[in-house]
Amino acid sequence: FSAVRPMIKESLEAAGLTVQYDEKASSDVYSTIDGNVDAFDIVIAPGDPSVFGDDADLLLRWWYAGDTWTNSRMHWKGQDSYNQVQDLLEKAQQATGQAQKDLWHQTFDVISENVPLYPIFHRKTPTAYDGETLVDFKPIAVTGLSFVGVGSTK
């Protein structure tokens, strides 16, 4: 985080905000802000559920459906945009193919226009392997490697 702190500060100040950092451990941050609407103006915190995969429904629900973030931390639950996102998530869960993707895109649009929680970094997960020595190895879309059913020529 320290490497990007100046860039975040500069961007927020360019938007007209006065920035004062009060850096804390995650557990301290959450115990301070949970349920206290006046505890902060902006919180920048790490979190990356993409380690569980790239399923759009899982990732959207992680942040925007459960009470921990929507009610205790963002104080967004119950607002019209919250209800709209929940409706879109339910419709997307029932849909398939392009119709499902279109509903997820609509959900992201509502989130980006209304919700006070939005990612500022997006992770890329590289995987490197030697295809000559690992038989039947396939990269996976999450952090880590899976060697189930894989053999080696060495």
What are these regions (language model features)?
Residues 1-10, 119:
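Bilobed "Venus flytrap"/periplasmic-binding protein-like clamshell domains
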Residues 32-39, 60-90, 121-154:
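Short, solvent-exposed loop/beta-turn-alpha elements that line the ligand-binding surface or hinge
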Residues 2-6, 24, 75-83, 95-102:
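Soluble non-cytosolic domains of exported or imported proteins
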Residues 6, 10, 38, 42-46, ...:
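Feature representing long, continuous alpha-helical segments
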Residues 15-68, 103:
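Periplasmic binding protein-like
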Residues 41-46, 95-130:
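Bilobed periplasmic-binding protein-like "clamshell/Venus-flytrap" ligand-binding domains
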Residues 12, 33, 92, 100, ...:
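Hydrophobic, well-ordered secondary-structure elements that form the walls
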Residues 9-20, 150:
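C-terminal amphipathic alpha-helical "assembly" element
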